[in-house]
Design a protein with these regions (language model features):
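Active-site rim/loop-helix segments in enzyme catalytic domains that contact anionic ligands
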Residues: 1-123, 149-150
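Metal-dependent de-N-acetylase/amidase catalytic core
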Residues: 1-3, 99-105, 109-274
Length: 274
């Protein structure tokens, strides 16, 4: 289960999701917190494409929720997602203050918790993937992370899922460093466990023409209302990194290690060196 805040957040994990479903023949679902109605700041070209003045906040909040649902359904088809569960919380504004969401002023937290609890109980997921737990980011992102962590903490079944946090490494950049959100103990990353890695950038096929970055580009391309991600993320991420939360049992690392070893061996492999 991939837990995110907005349609398009999952593009950080898109190649992992694609390889799990298409190559390992696994199952991936998503839980998306907001309706996406606030994502209109970079919709200038999308407004032309959709024939609506989407940079107008009133019009955007009327039409963007449906538009972005369709966009994520299209992206989900690329990634092989089985089901997308929409939590329908308001995408009200950009703020790094997570408290109005986490403490239930702006979001219906009890509704989210009940739905996540039901999903985890019925679906018995092996893994939960969240966004990065770090300060200075969107309050919606932080709250979605905590919702996923608390759902795992509440889980009473015999098959508790392992929960990991995903991040992207852009071309030429240093590895992201994640430790958790200060003041929120449940978000602590086990820094003794190195991040698990998925390489999008290695080349394969005739004359090394292709890479799995193409899959990520396919998913990003579905978000025509979101100009910034298309301008800034297309073909720029070399690796997906996944960090191990401290709330997991230490022996669960072997399960995650096996997943990423299996992913590294699946699908198209690098051409042998000559």
């Amino acid at each position: 289960l991939v837990v995110t805040a907005h349609p398009d957040d999952e593009t950080v994990f898109s190649v992992t999701m694609f390889k799990i479903t298409h190559e390992l023949k696994g199952v991936v679902d998503m839980a998306v917190m907001t309706d996406g109605g606030g994502g209109f700041a970079d919709a200038q070209l999308g407004a032309v494409y959709y024939g609506l003045p989407l940079t107008d906040s009133i019009i955007a909040r009327t039409h963007l929720p449906m538009i972005r649902k369709q966009e994520i359904l299209n992206a989900g088809k690329v990634m092989g997602v089985r089901n997308i569960y929409f939590m329908e919380q308001p995408d009200d504004l950009y703020s790094t203050n997570y408290e109005p969401y986490l403490y239930g002023k702006n979001w219906d937290i009890s509704y989210i918790e009940k739905r996540l609890d039901k999903l985890l109980a019925e679906r018995e997921y092996d893994f939960i993937i969240t966004m990065s737990p770090r300060t200075g980011q969107h309050g919606h992102h932080i709250t979605s992370v905590i919702m996923g962590l608390r759902a795992v903490e509440r889980y009473k079944g015999s098959k508790k899922p392992i929960i990991i946090a995903g991040a992207s490494k852009m071309n030429g950049n240093a590895d992201p460093v994640l430790t958790g959100i200060p003041g929120i103990d449940i978000s602590k990353i086990n820094t003794n466990v190195p991040p698990f890695r998925l390489n999008r950038a290695y080349r394969f096929a005739e004359n090394d023409k292709l890479s799995y970055k193409i899959v990520a580009d396919w998913t990003i391309a579905e978000y025509k209302s979101q100009g910034a991600i298309q301008e800034n993320a297309m073909h720029r991420t070399d690796e997906e990194l996944y960090f191990y939360y401290d709330i997991n049992p230490l022996n669960g690392t072997e399960k995650v290690k096996k997943l990423f070893e299996d992913l590294s061996k699946s699908g198209f492999l690098p051409a042998p060196k000559k």
